[in-house]
Protein backbone atom coordinates (compact mmCIF):
# COMPACT_ATOMS: atom_id res chain seq x y z
CA UNK A 1 0.00 0.00 0.00
CA UNK A 2 2.80 2.40 0.93
CA UNK A 3 4.55 1.61 -2.33
CA UNK A 4 1.38 2.37 -4.28
CA UNK A 5 0.90 5.61 -2.33
CA UNK A 6 4.48 6.68 -2.99
CA UNK A 7 4.01 5.85 -6.68
CA UNK A 8 0.81 7.92 -6.92
CA UNK A 9 2.43 10.79 -5.02
CA UNK A 10 5.40 10.76 -7.37
CA UNK A 11 3.04 10.77 -10.34
CA UNK A 12 1.10 13.73 -8.93
CA UNK A 13 4.29 15.68 -8.18
CA UNK A 14 5.63 14.89 -11.63
CA UNK A 15 2.35 15.98 -13.21
CA UNK A 16 2.47 19.14 -11.13
CA UNK A 17 5.97 19.93 -12.33
CA UNK A 18 4.95 19.26 -15.93
CA UNK A 19 1.88 21.47 -15.60
CA UNK A 20 3.99 24.22 -14.05
CA UNK A 21 6.49 23.88 -16.88
CA UNK A 22 3.74 24.10 -19.50
CA UNK A 23 2.15 27.10 -17.78
CA UNK A 24 5.53 28.82 -17.48
CA UNK A 25 6.26 28.16 -21.14
CA UNK A 26 2.81 29.44 -22.12
CA UNK A 27 3.33 32.52 -19.94
CA UNK A 28 6.72 33.23 -21.51
CA UNK A 29 5.28 32.85 -25.01
CA UNK A 30 2.40 35.19 -24.12
CA UNK A 31 4.83 37.65 -22.57
CA UNK A 32 7.04 37.54 -25.66
CA UNK A 33 4.03 38.10 -27.93
CA UNK A 34 2.95 41.11 -25.88
CA UNK A 35 6.39 42.68 -26.38
CA UNK A 36 5.99 42.66 -30.17
CA UNK A 37 4.58 45.61 -32.10
CA UNK A 38 2.88 45.18 -35.46
CA UNK A 39 4.26 47.26 -38.34
CA UNK A 40 2.90 47.75 -41.86
CA UNK A 41 5.12 47.60 -44.93
CA UNK A 42 3.46 47.91 -48.33
CA UNK A 43 0.83 45.18 -48.52
CA UNK A 44 2.08 43.20 -45.51
CA UNK A 45 2.22 43.34 -41.74
CA UNK A 46 4.96 41.97 -39.51
CA UNK A 47 5.59 42.09 -35.75
CA UNK A 48 8.94 43.08 -34.25
CA UNK A 49 10.14 43.62 -30.66
CA UNK A 50 9.26 46.97 -29.15
CA UNK A 51 12.08 49.48 -29.32
CA UNK A 52 13.71 47.98 -32.42
CA UNK A 53 15.37 50.52 -34.73
CA UNK A 54 13.53 50.27 -38.05
CA UNK A 55 14.31 51.90 -41.39
CA UNK A 56 12.37 51.30 -44.60
CA UNK A 57 12.33 52.40 -48.24
CA UNK A 58 8.99 52.47 -50.05
CA UNK A 59 8.56 52.74 -53.80
CA UNK A 60 5.62 53.61 -56.04
CA UNK A 61 6.17 53.71 -59.82
CA UNK A 62 9.49 52.08 -58.88
CA UNK A 63 10.60 55.41 -57.32
CA UNK A 64 11.29 56.06 -53.65
CA UNK A 65 8.64 58.00 -51.77
CA UNK A 66 9.98 59.65 -48.60
CA UNK A 67 8.24 61.16 -45.61
CA UNK A 68 9.29 64.78 -45.03
CA UNK A 69 7.10 66.23 -42.28
CA UNK A 70 3.81 65.96 -40.42
CA UNK A 71 3.53 69.75 -40.70
CA UNK A 72 3.28 69.88 -44.47
CA UNK A 73 1.44 73.21 -44.78
CA UNK A 74 4.28 75.07 -43.10
CA UNK A 75 7.06 73.10 -44.83
CA UNK A 76 6.02 72.68 -48.45
CA UNK A 77 6.71 76.24 -49.67
CA UNK A 78 10.13 76.30 -48.06
CA UNK A 79 11.00 72.86 -49.47
CA UNK A 80 9.82 73.79 -52.97
CA UNK A 81 11.64 77.14 -52.99
CA UNK A 82 14.88 75.55 -51.81
CA UNK A 83 14.67 72.80 -54.44
CA UNK A 84 14.00 75.33 -57.22
CA UNK A 85 17.02 77.36 -56.13
CA UNK A 86 19.24 74.27 -56.03
CA UNK A 87 18.03 73.13 -59.46
CA UNK A 88 18.71 76.55 -60.96
CA UNK A 89 22.24 76.46 -59.53
CA UNK A 90 22.80 72.87 -60.66
CA UNK A 91 23.48 71.66 -57.12
CA UNK A 92 20.30 69.69 -56.39
CA UNK A 93 20.87 66.36 -54.66
CA UNK A 94 20.64 63.37 -56.99
CA UNK A 95 20.49 65.22 -60.32
CA UNK A 96 22.47 67.55 -62.59
CA UNK A 97 19.30 68.67 -64.38
CA UNK A 98 18.30 72.35 -64.42
CA UNK A 99 14.95 73.77 -63.38
CA UNK A 100 12.43 74.22 -66.20
CA UNK A 101 8.94 74.68 -64.74
CA UNK A 102 6.57 74.21 -61.80
CA UNK A 103 3.35 72.22 -62.26
CA UNK A 104 0.66 72.61 -59.56
CA UNK A 105 -0.97 69.29 -58.71
CA UNK A 106 -4.12 68.56 -56.74
CA UNK A 107 -4.57 68.99 -52.97
CA UNK A 108 -1.76 71.55 -52.73
CA UNK A 109 0.90 69.19 -54.09
CA UNK A 110 3.62 70.57 -56.38
CA UNK A 111 5.71 69.07 -59.20
CA UNK A 112 9.05 70.57 -60.24
CA UNK A 113 10.26 69.66 -63.72
CA UNK A 114 13.96 69.95 -64.56
CA UNK A 115 15.89 68.95 -67.66
CA UNK A 116 19.31 67.71 -68.73
CA UNK A 117 19.76 67.34 -72.50
CA UNK A 118 16.84 65.22 -73.76
CA UNK A 119 15.71 63.87 -70.41
CA UNK A 120 13.58 65.27 -67.62
CA UNK A 121 13.62 64.83 -63.85
CA UNK A 122 10.64 65.19 -61.53
CA UNK A 123 10.77 66.39 -57.94
CA UNK A 124 7.27 66.10 -56.56
CA UNK A 125 6.09 67.30 -53.15
CA UNK A 126 2.93 65.48 -52.10
CA UNK A 127 0.63 66.93 -49.44
CA UNK A 128 -2.08 64.84 -47.82
CA UNK A 129 -5.41 66.14 -46.55
CA UNK A 130 -4.13 65.69 -42.99
CA UNK A 131 -1.01 67.76 -43.61
CA UNK A 132 1.66 65.08 -44.10
CA UNK A 133 4.33 65.97 -46.66
CA UNK A 134 6.18 63.47 -48.87
CA UNK A 135 8.84 63.81 -51.57
CA UNK A 136 9.55 61.69 -54.64
CA UNK A 137 12.20 62.10 -57.34
CA UNK A 138 11.96 60.40 -60.75
CA UNK A 139 14.71 60.74 -63.36
CA UNK A 140 15.40 59.83 -67.00
CA UNK A 141 11.95 60.73 -68.31
CA UNK A 142 11.88 61.09 -72.09
CA UNK A 143 10.15 63.92 -73.92
CA UNK A 144 7.57 61.42 -75.16
CA UNK A 145 6.88 60.31 -71.59
CA UNK A 146 6.69 63.80 -70.10
CA UNK A 147 2.93 64.42 -70.22
CA UNK A 148 2.10 60.87 -69.15
CA UNK A 149 4.55 61.21 -66.28
CA UNK A 150 2.92 64.44 -65.12
CA UNK A 151 -0.47 62.73 -65.12
CA UNK A 152 0.95 59.88 -63.03
CA UNK A 153 2.18 62.41 -60.47
CA UNK A 154 -1.26 64.03 -60.48
CA UNK A 155 -2.83 60.62 -59.89
CA UNK A 156 -0.43 60.03 -56.99
CA UNK A 157 -1.29 63.42 -55.47
CA UNK A 158 -4.92 62.26 -55.35
CA UNK A 159 -4.04 58.82 -53.99
CA UNK A 160 -1.86 59.52 -50.95
CA UNK A 161 -3.15 59.68 -47.39
CA UNK A 162 -1.90 60.01 -43.82
CA UNK A 163 -2.03 57.08 -41.41
CA UNK A 164 -1.14 56.67 -37.72
CA UNK A 165 1.80 54.21 -37.74
CA UNK A 166 -0.01 51.72 -35.48
CA UNK A 167 -3.05 51.53 -37.78
CA UNK A 168 -3.29 49.30 -40.84
CA UNK A 169 -4.10 50.95 -44.17
CA UNK A 170 -7.62 50.37 -45.50
CA UNK A 171 -8.31 47.45 -47.81
CA UNK A 172 -6.29 47.76 -51.00
CA UNK A 173 -3.94 50.38 -49.54
CA UNK A 174 -0.14 50.27 -49.85
CA UNK A 175 1.44 51.25 -46.52
CA UNK A 176 4.22 53.85 -46.55
CA UNK A 177 5.78 55.69 -43.63
CA UNK A 178 2.96 57.39 -41.68
CA UNK A 179 0.60 56.95 -44.62
CA UNK A 180 -0.61 54.87 -47.55
CA UNK A 181 -1.35 55.10 -51.27
CA UNK A 182 -4.34 53.80 -53.24
CA UNK A 183 -3.03 53.59 -56.80
CA UNK A 184 -4.53 50.17 -57.45
CA UNK A 185 -3.04 46.82 -56.56
CA UNK A 186 -1.90 45.72 -60.03
CA UNK A 187 -1.34 48.93 -62.03
CA UNK A 188 2.08 50.25 -61.00
CA UNK A 189 5.34 48.81 -59.68
CA UNK A 190 5.65 48.72 -55.89
CA UNK A 191 8.37 47.58 -53.51
CA UNK A 192 9.48 47.83 -49.89
CA UNK A 193 12.83 47.18 -48.25
CA UNK A 194 12.99 47.21 -44.44
CA UNK A 195 15.90 46.71 -42.08
CA UNK A 196 15.57 46.47 -38.29
CA UNK A 197 18.13 46.33 -35.49
CA UNK A 198 16.39 44.11 -32.95
CA UNK A 199 15.85 45.52 -29.46
CA UNK A 200 17.23 43.22 -26.77
CA UNK A 201 19.47 41.38 -29.25
CA UNK A 202 22.21 43.83 -30.32
CA UNK A 203 23.88 41.28 -32.58
CA UNK A 204 20.72 40.47 -34.53
CA UNK A 205 18.97 42.15 -37.44
CA UNK A 206 15.83 41.42 -39.43
CA UNK A 207 15.36 42.45 -43.06
CA UNK A 208 12.26 42.28 -45.23
CA UNK A 209 12.00 42.77 -48.99
CA UNK A 210 8.88 42.62 -51.11
CA UNK A 211 8.71 43.64 -54.77
CA UNK A 212 6.88 43.01 -58.02
CA UNK A 213 8.92 40.82 -60.39
CA UNK A 214 9.06 40.28 -64.16
CA UNK A 215 10.66 36.82 -64.06
CA UNK A 216 11.00 34.11 -61.41
CA UNK A 217 14.42 32.96 -60.24
CA UNK A 218 15.34 29.56 -58.81
CA UNK A 219 13.75 29.01 -55.42
CA UNK A 220 15.59 29.50 -52.12
CA UNK A 221 16.08 25.76 -51.60
CA UNK A 222 17.21 25.22 -55.20
CA UNK A 223 19.86 27.92 -54.84
CA UNK A 224 20.94 26.59 -51.45
CA UNK A 225 21.37 23.05 -52.78
CA UNK A 226 23.45 24.40 -55.68
CA UNK A 227 25.51 26.40 -53.15
CA UNK A 228 24.40 29.62 -54.82
CA UNK A 229 24.17 31.24 -51.42
CA UNK A 230 22.72 34.66 -50.73
CA UNK A 231 25.04 37.13 -49.00
CA UNK A 232 24.31 36.30 -45.35
CA UNK A 233 24.64 32.53 -45.78
CA UNK A 234 27.53 32.95 -48.20
CA UNK A 235 29.56 34.93 -45.66
CA UNK A 236 29.13 32.19 -43.07
CA UNK A 237 29.96 29.46 -45.59
CA UNK A 238 33.13 31.29 -46.63
CA UNK A 239 34.23 31.75 -43.02
CA UNK A 240 33.87 28.14 -41.94
CA UNK A 241 31.57 25.16 -41.96
CA UNK A 242 27.86 25.84 -41.61
CA UNK A 243 25.29 23.73 -39.83
CA UNK A 244 21.91 23.40 -41.54
CA UNK A 245 19.15 23.76 -38.96
CA UNK A 246 16.22 23.85 -41.39
CA UNK A 247 15.63 23.38 -45.12
CA UNK A 248 11.97 22.97 -45.94
CA UNK A 249 8.79 24.33 -47.55
CA UNK A 250 6.84 26.44 -45.06
CA UNK A 251 3.27 27.72 -45.25
CA UNK A 252 2.94 31.07 -43.48
CA UNK A 253 -0.56 32.52 -43.22
CA UNK A 254 -1.44 31.42 -46.73
CA UNK A 255 1.98 32.23 -48.23
CA UNK A 256 3.62 29.10 -49.70
CA UNK A 257 7.24 29.90 -48.91
CA UNK A 258 10.54 28.08 -48.42
CA UNK A 259 12.81 28.28 -45.38
CA UNK A 260 16.53 27.78 -44.90
CA UNK A 261 18.22 28.28 -41.52
CA UNK A 262 21.95 27.82 -40.86
CA UNK A 263 24.37 28.50 -38.02
CA UNK A 264 28.14 28.74 -37.74
CA UNK A 265 30.69 29.03 -34.95
CA UNK A 266 33.48 31.44 -35.92
CA UNK A 267 36.27 32.66 -33.63
CA UNK A 268 34.26 31.68 -30.56
CA UNK A 269 31.17 33.59 -31.69
CA UNK A 270 27.81 32.20 -32.76
CA UNK A 271 26.26 33.36 -36.03
CA UNK A 272 22.86 32.71 -37.61
CA UNK A 273 21.40 33.24 -41.06
CA UNK A 274 17.71 32.37 -41.37
CA UNK A 275 15.78 32.99 -44.57
CA UNK A 276 12.16 32.73 -45.67
CA UNK A 277 11.34 33.31 -49.32
CA UNK A 278 8.32 33.26 -51.62
CA UNK A 279 9.14 33.22 -55.35
CA UNK A 280 6.30 35.59 -56.21
CA UNK A 281 3.90 35.79 -59.11
CA UNK A 282 5.14 37.61 -62.20
CA UNK A 283 3.89 41.21 -62.50
CA UNK A 284 1.79 41.06 -59.34
CA UNK A 285 1.80 43.55 -56.47
CA UNK A 286 -0.56 41.46 -54.34
CA UNK A 287 1.52 38.27 -54.74
CA UNK A 288 5.03 39.73 -54.98
CA UNK A 289 8.43 38.22 -54.31
CA UNK A 290 9.02 38.09 -50.53
CA UNK A 291 12.30 37.68 -48.66
CA UNK A 292 12.42 37.74 -44.85
CA UNK A 293 15.79 37.28 -43.17
CA UNK A 294 17.40 37.12 -39.74
CA UNK A 295 21.13 37.74 -39.67
CA UNK A 296 23.96 38.36 -37.24
CA UNK A 297 26.35 41.31 -36.98
CA UNK A 298 30.11 40.90 -36.52
CA UNK A 299 29.80 40.90 -32.74
CA UNK A 300 27.96 37.59 -32.88
CA UNK A 301 24.61 36.42 -31.55
CA UNK A 302 23.50 36.56 -27.92
CA UNK A 303 20.94 33.76 -28.28
CA UNK A 304 21.79 31.04 -25.78
CA UNK A 305 21.05 28.16 -28.14
CA UNK A 306 19.91 27.27 -31.65
CA UNK A 307 16.49 26.48 -30.21
CA UNK A 308 16.15 29.94 -28.66
CA UNK A 309 17.19 31.62 -31.92
CA UNK A 310 14.72 29.53 -33.93
CA UNK A 311 11.93 30.23 -31.44
CA UNK A 312 12.45 33.97 -31.83
CA UNK A 313 12.57 33.58 -35.61
CA UNK A 314 9.33 31.60 -35.61
CA UNK A 315 7.51 34.38 -33.75
CA UNK A 316 8.57 36.89 -36.39
CA UNK A 317 7.80 34.56 -39.31
CA UNK A 318 4.37 33.64 -37.96
CA UNK A 319 3.47 37.32 -37.69
CA UNK A 320 3.97 37.88 -41.44
CA UNK A 321 0.59 38.37 -43.09
CA UNK A 322 -0.73 39.83 -46.32
CA UNK A 323 -3.03 42.79 -45.77
CA UNK A 324 -6.58 42.54 -47.17
Question: Where are these predicted regions, by residue range?
Answer:
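A short acidic-to-branched-hydrophobic micro-motif
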Residues: 54-94, 137, 190-231, 259, ...
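Signature of long, low-cysteine stretches enriched in small and polar/charged residues
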Residues: 86-130, 209, 215-284
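Acidic, serine/threonine- and glycine-rich low-complexity intrinsically disordered segments
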Residues: 144-256
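Surface-exposed amphipathic alpha-helical segments
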Residues: 52-53, 137-177, 292-324
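Bacterial N-terminal signal peptides
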Residues: 7-18
Amino acid sequence: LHAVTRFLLCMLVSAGFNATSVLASSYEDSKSESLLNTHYFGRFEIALPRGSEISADYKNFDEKIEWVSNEGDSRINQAVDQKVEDLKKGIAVGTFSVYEKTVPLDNGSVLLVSRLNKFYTFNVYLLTAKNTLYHMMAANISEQGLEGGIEKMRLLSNSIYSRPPHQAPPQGGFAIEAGYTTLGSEKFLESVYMGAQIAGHPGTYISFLTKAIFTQEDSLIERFEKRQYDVSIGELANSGSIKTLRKRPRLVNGIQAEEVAVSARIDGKQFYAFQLEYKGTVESNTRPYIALELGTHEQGSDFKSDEEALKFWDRVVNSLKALP
